[in-house]
UniProtKB/Swiss-Prot annotation:
Organism (species): Sinorhizobium fredii (strain NBRC 101917 / NGR234)
Other information: Reaction proceeds by a ping-pong mechanism involving intermediate methylation of a conserved cysteine residue.
Residues holding S-adenosyl-L-methionine: 208-209, 240, 262-264, 339
Cofactor entry: [4Fe-4S] cluster
Lineage: Bacteria, Pseudomonadati, Pseudomonadota, Alphaproteobacteria, Hyphomicrobiales
InterPro entries: Aldolase_TIM, Methyltransferase_A, RlmN_N, RNA_MTrfase_RlmN, rRNA_lsu_MTrfase_RlmN/Cfr, rSAM
Domain Radical SAM core span(s) in chain numbering: 130-379
Cofactor note: Binds 1 [4Fe-4S] cluster. The cluster is coordinated with 3 cysteines and an exchangeable S-adenosyl-L-methionine.
Tree of life domain: Bacteria
Coiled coil: none
UniProt name for this protein: Dual-specificity RNA methyltransferase RlmN
Length: 411
């Protein structure tokens, strides 16, 4: 199939021109817990007796109304707004590019300040609309340290952790762009849930390993689930980890969100190759941590993610060992057809084999949905994320277009 025909499968929408924010040392009020916001306000002269009220006002404007300009805070005095503008910011990150897949999936390339990285950094955030729900896939790091052999993000070296502000900014910006705040319009032709919120769920499944950035991820998710602000139910927030065992219990105890494990193999020999962190935290330790996860029940199951790699991990014997491995753990098993990317040596399992694998697991009593590939034409599918600052070589990109899907962006 000619590359031009493949390109027509996706509408690649350039983001509107957004002026980069000038370099500034102003701290952001986004991503601060209430007590930390209160301390900053007191330091800038807000009377103690007013602090609680001022924090409530700011919280409402930032997380209920979704404003990104202090001047929009109409019930805050002019003097207070001027003080806030002088000392703080609530600006959104720069949108470098917005791509819209033929299936309605949206991917944003966002640029953040260097903050120790030496130059501005870029990450990707993905929105996946489905009937009755809309899921936002959020990144926690710029790049990744884990080098999972089947994952495109793993080919990009870790640059730095994202701050709590930058993690939350992905959600705020997506809600801006989708018209998911009060008095905002949904883009014409956008595929979103017919009723209610445009973003109903968030998954920490973007770039990076969330549990290697525990404190910032914790703060961001506690704010996202705060009932007086963004108000996302913790049962609609899923954190995915490759298996950082010491932090798994803390995730349940201190954050309380749903847990997903990037499993992908049923024995240590294969998982050492696919997910190298397994050499440090082997399957026995990982399964023990899962069994001890706070709140684990049939109503709060752990999701195990399993990418289907042809002739690697997709045999019926693998399925039998998977059922044995998870025995006694309330679980759902997401089977993920492998999403190809330039330079990979893996292939996706045949569809008949994926269905046979799923049927065996289902008959053993586990829900085993096959994840429908979304956003492949804009490199937004599971395992395909990689920031534009790590652009693929032109020859790889052209080969990939000819092989399957649209390019990620012109050099």
């Amino acid at each position: 199939m000619p590359a031009t025909e493949i390109l027509n499968r996706a509408d690649i929408v350039k983001a509107p021109q957004v002026r980069p924010q000038p370099q500034t040392e102003k701290p952001s009020l986004i991503g601060l817990l209430r007590e930390d916001m209160a301390k900053l306000l007191v330091e800038k002269g807000v009377p103690e007796r007013q602090v609680k009220m001022r924090v409530s006002q700011l919280w409402h404007w930032l997380y209920v109304r979704g404003v990104s300009d202090f001047d929009q805070m109409s019930n805050v005095s002019k003097d207070m707004r001027e003080m806030l503008k002088e000392h703080f910011t609530v600006a959104r990150p720069e949108i470098v590019e917005e791509q819209v897949s033929g299936d309605g999936t949206r991917k944003w390339l966002l640029r953040f300040p260097p903050r120790g990285a030496g130059r501005p950094v870029e990450i990707e955030t993905v929105y996946i609309p489905e009937e009755g729900r809309g899921t936002l896939c959020i990144s926690s790091q710029v790049g990744c340290t884990l080098t999972c052999s089947f994952c495109h993000t793993g080919t990009q070296k870790l640059v730095r952790n994202l701050t709590a502000e930058e993690i939350l900014a992905q959600l705020l910006l997506a809600r801006d762009r989708l018209g998911d705040f009060p008095e905002r319009d949904t883009p014409q032709g956008a595929i979103v849930p017919a009723e209610g919120r445009k973003i109903t769920n968030i998954v920490m499944m973007g770039m990076g390993e969330p549990l290697y950035n525990f404190d910032n991820v914790k703060t961001a998710l506690l704010i996202a689930s705060d009932g007086d602000g963004l108000s996302l139910s913790k049962r609609r927030i899923t954190l995915s980890t490759s298996g950082i065992v010491p932090e798994i219990y803390r995730t349940g105890e201190e954050i309380g969100v749903m847990l997903a494990i990037s499993l992908h193999a049923v024995n240590d020999e294969l998982r050492d190759m696919l997910v190298p962190i397994n050499k440090k935290y082997p399957l026995k330790e990982l399964m023990e941590a899962c069994r001890a996860y706070p709140g684990l029940s049939n109503a709060r199951r752990i999701t195990f993610e399993y990418v289907m790699l042809k002739d690697v991990n997709d045999s019926l014997q693998d399925a039998k060992e998977l059922v044995k491995l998870l025995k006694g753990i309330p679980a759902k098993i997401n089977l993920i057809p492998f999403n190809p990317w330039p330079g990979t040596n893996y292939q996706c399992s045949d569809w008949e084999q994926i269905e046979a694998f799923a049927d065996f697991i289902n008959q053993a009593g586990y829900a085993s949905p096959i994840r429908t590939p979304r956003g492949r034409d804009i490199l937004a599918a599971c395992g395909q994320l990689k920031s534009e600052s790590e652009r693929m070589r032109k020859v790889d990109r052209l080969a990939f277009e000819a092989m399957m899907i649209a390019n990620h962006g012109e050099d």
